[in-house]
Amino acid sequence: MNSPPPKLKSTPFNARPNSPPHAGGIEDVGTTFNPLCSPLLTDLYQLTMCYAYWKANRHLQPSTFELFFRKNPFKGEFTIFAGLTEVIAFIRNWSLTRKDIDFLESTQALGAHVDSNFFKWLSKLNTDDVKIYAVKEGTVIFPKEPLIRIEGPLAICQLLETTIVNLTNYASLITTNAARMRNAAGEKKVLLEFGLRRAQGPDGAISASRYSFMGGFDGTSNVLASQMF
């Protein structure tokens, strides 16, 4: 997640619920719609890097992380940015539970090699000092442009990285594909998403329904998605 100096024009917001309206203009994002979206939905090396920062007393160092991509999907000329609402909801609600901490302490990769005081610190970690800058969700974007900029203490920003990439990659892929189909079909055609039976699991199906609609589809066969959104 590195890029040239950003030129984002959106305004920053604090990640906590009592903050001002965030970039992208969404006033209230609540929680994520996917129950799998938790602080543990990350790569192990993010936790080991966080521990290294903590041991070196660099965990509170001010830092900036930026999200970008290198190539448009489908050999196309543009991408539609999506997933920002989920990113913001995830960051606002980010908090490790006692159960999460107990699990991390029990793992072979961390428990036997990590100072126990690190887990105590981790249990109190939050996103109070995290700020986000972003282009508006649904914007046409291009490769190597900064899309999201995360500012805050180094350790927490590191722990957010993997999940942010996950929440935006698939969302942008589906939204872009839907927009391409809408452009090809024209404005007068009715487009219905019917991918549930072939989707990559329930969470993939729900996401596909949501972001197909964002990309220009008129409806979905997915009854649950219709109820949720």
Language model regions located:
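Ordered alpha/beta subdomains of enzyme catalytic regions
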Residues: 2-228
